[in-house]
A protein has these predicted regions:
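Short, structured interface segments
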Residues: 1-9
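Short, conserved, GDST-rich strand-edge loop motifs in beta-rich repeat architectures
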Residues: 158-165
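A conserved beta-strand-loop-helix scaffold within acyl/acetyltransferase catalytic domains
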Residues: 8-154, 167-169, 175-176, 180, ...
Length: 212
């Protein structure tokens, strides 16, 4: 998920943040800087923005290079070692357009959760759940599906699946962040890594059923 998930300089609490819809081009910029696979084609994008910062965990400093990564309107860097600034984007979630089919005599409206990323130097506690809840409230899906992907890159563990591990055994349950949100595993597959030649990735398909 993140470009450098091992380094988490601070913890950010989603309860101190606010969700806003954002244009896809703004989400693309954030994802290019903070998601290992970059941006993707999406229909609906949401950002999580700092409303207030409290607690020692949120006061750790980050280098100014991080400030170059967030060009979303309403956020202005104030200094090289400011940690959290009101209006700063700390996470982004992107979803597909609706896909519809018939199931048991009724129309089912399904969406894919395509991307989620938080700032690469941070861990956003409750961020995934808060962004997902906002999307569900706006669009009332019958279900939401997504994929968690885990692999290993040179010198670091890549966390595209919202979990992390150094070996195949460590990665057995790498999709736990989805499970905690109510998603159920439907299938998993192994395939050659897109990031590292000779390495294998594991992909788990998850689905959150909301109305059936």
């Amino acid at each position: 998920m993140l470009n450098d998930p091992i380094i988490t300089d601070r913890t950010i609490f989603a309860r101190n943040c606010v969700v806003r819809k954002i244009p896809c081009n703004e989400a693309d910029k954030f994802l290019a800087d903070n998601h290992i696979y970059g941006s993707a084609s999406c229909r609906y994008c949401y950002g999580l923005f700092v409303k207030r910062a409290t607690g020692a965990a949120e006061k750790k400093s980050a280098p100014d290079s991080r400030h170059e990564n967030a060009a979303i309107e309403g956020w202005t860097p104030r200094g090289q070692y400011d940690s959290l600034i009101t209006g700063e984007p700390v996470a982004v979630a992107c979803f597909s357009n609706a896909r519809r089919w018939e199931k048991n005599g009724r129309s089912v409206c399904s969406y894919e959760w395509v991307r989620y990323a938080s700032l690469k130097d941070s861990r956003v506690v409750g961020g995934m759940g808060k962004l997902l809840a906002a999307f569900i409230e706006d669009h009332h899906p019958d279900d939401v599906m997504t994929y968690a992907i885990s692999t290993v890159a040179p010198g670091r563990q890549v966390r595209t699946g919202y979990g992390i591990g150094k070996s195949e055994a460590d990665n057995a349950d790498f999709g736990n962040a989805f499970r905690k949100l109510g998603f159920v595993e439907e299938s998993r597959m192994t395939f050659p890594s897109r990031l590292v030649e000779g390495e294998m990735s594991v992909s788990i398909k998850f689905r959150l059923k909301l109305t059936y």
